Amino acid sequence: MSEPHQPPLLERVRLKIRLKHYSLRTEQAYLDWIKRFILFHRKRHPADMGAGEVEAFLTHLVAVRNVAASTQNQAKSALLFLYKEVLAIELPWLDHVERAKAPMRLPVVLTRDEVSLVLQRLEGVHALLGRLLYGTGMRIMEGVRLRVKDVEFARRQVVIRDGKGQKDRISVLPDGLLRPLRVQIEQALATHGQDLRAGHGNVWLPHALACKYPRAATEPGWQYVFPAPYRSVDPRSGIVRRHHLGDQAFQRAMRQAVRDAGIVKPATPRTLRHSFATHLLDAGYDIRTVQELLGHSNVSTTMIYTHVLNRGGRGVVSPLDRL
């Protein structure tokens, strides 16, 4: 009796990723790394390879390609997923892989005046999003994915769902954003109403929620605060729906605002988060509070901002100034 036909390897990977409800970004990244791994070994099938070939590829990324530690870790995760979840081949722990060293770099931080200059040069919805990122310490993807129900005006707080590491947290809602956010939400819900009348209006929901609350996708509270300006086709389901504002559009707007402000620091949307943390510590807030607002698992991650505060030898008089 012949073995049942199996779909191509990459299609099997895609199906397994979707079965586990990983994000589209993770799906795209894993498939890309698996393709690179196969091409690196001259199109040999991964089932005919093992830990040695995985180690060779990951070591090559560090020794020859000089990739960052986070890049190597993503490649390793993709290959471990391939072997364990798709091919059902257990690999021994890859202790002998040359690891990319994560450099000890201080985060780029803007002064309060520089933040003000940048925010003044952002326009439209990007201006509000920029103020929200700086005012709450959100990551950019947390900002664009914010849902209406998670802006709690009465409590002056924002609930940040499923952040990095799949953890929810709460951050402060600045008083200066109360009115602009109310206006933005009114506009977002008006757009949602138009989508409903056009026969659409089903926002994307995580799989478990979509199964548990099948009607939630059309409810106002689940809509994005920053909806995309147009509807698009969901690449997985084929459903026409309105996604959230794209992060790349804001990144471009931020780069332009930094240039227009005459700031030479390599500031990005993440810089607003770094500046939020540093300015809170500079204002005297304790590091544990800042840790919770940022959603760091370990306080040592938050400690990097204390090094920024100490930069420049505060309290030390340069010998040059004594000449």
Cite the ranges covered by each PLM segment.
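Conserved catalytic core of the tyrosine transesterase superfamily
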Residues: 1-323
